Amino acid sequence: TPGTEAPAEMNFFFPQFSSLCMAENCSHNLHNLLTLRGAQVRDARAWAHYLDEAIGLFAGESDLVFTSHHWPVWGRERLLAYMKKQRDMYRYLHDQTVRLMNKGLTGIEIAETLQLPEELAREWYNRGYYGSVSHNVKAIYQRYMGWFDANPAHLHPLTPVEAGKKYVEFMGGADALLANAREAYGKGDYRWVAQVVDHLVFADPDNKEARALQADALEQLGYQAENATWRNFYLTGAMELRDGVVESAAAGVKMPPDLVRSLSPATIFDAMAVHLNGPNAAGKTITVNLRFTDTGQDYHLILENCVLNHGEGTVDGADATLSLPRTTLDALVAGDSDPAAAFTSGEVSVEGDGEKLGLLFSLVDADEFWFNIVTP
């Protein structure tokens, strides 16, 4: 079932048990068509199609349906009703979003307009505890239309910081904005408070009154959210406003060695490429051959035009040749081996211009694990 809950997924039937496993394609809530943590948009139409296919192939022979993360449904009649309403939920969201999109509504407008019909919405397994009608509708719009809603005012907006400063000025200054926002808060208009005070927080992140009011508004939105992921985002945002970005030991978690071993060399080199600091690489050209002494595989890396390309085999005229076992590369990537120790022990050797090799690796940035979300 490619393109549904995951890029690669499958439903499978156990005939000896009259049992059908639906992986994550049929669950006891409305699932995400776009996970809020960030990913490519999933295909609601394909999701409904594969549910329909599973019903046709297996529902008539199944006495039990179960999923990866949720509890089973017993009984042929009950499981058929469950699967059909899950199917129709995704199909309704898809078809009605496209219908309204073709009438000229934007993703935000559709999300405020579209609701599931009562016969689907009343089933607790169709409720938005994880995905939501609102952000799934926006995801369907995004899948077909992208980020731009065709309004040229949205084509090249100012950054949140620059726009925030101008919004605050237009609203009569920070004190006037806060006075109006507190009045709106008192009326329970928390969505509007969060939207307005966000401008002041980005214009003046040291404004304690703005941070406190914004945190209170986000907290109230979190308490009111049926959706667990929305609640978590709201409450985490409130925590950042009150306490700053709170770091934890999770930042020190290493990549699992078995995961690193499963990566192809091309995937590792692609990961290097997206970590290359392009501006710092300006004007630099470096070519490195890389030999895996245990597998006999050869590759090359070429830095030019501020881009790191790679390919199989060696190239003539390389600045340096790096030789090491693939297992050593895996250990270095996983953080289980010290580069200096690997060179000292002879596991890793370099022929040619070692300084250029060092320069190449110095241009590869490390990820910033902790960063601001609701503050600039």
List where the protein language model places each region:
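Well-ordered alpha-helical segments embedded in enzymatic catalytic cores
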Residues: 46-50, 180, 196, 328-331
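Metallo-beta-lactamase
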Residues: 2-103
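A generic alpha-helix preference that emphasizes hydrophobic side chains
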Residues: 9, 44, 107, 224, ...
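Feature captures hydrophobic
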Residues: 189-195, 202, 206, 216-376
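A short local loop/turn or secondary-structure capping micro-motif enriched for an aromatic residue
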Residues: 5-8, 29-31, 210, 309-310, ...
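Accessory terminal helices/loops
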Residues: 56-64, 68-263
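Generic signal for short, ordered secondary-structure residues
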Residues: 26, 33, 72, 76-79, ...
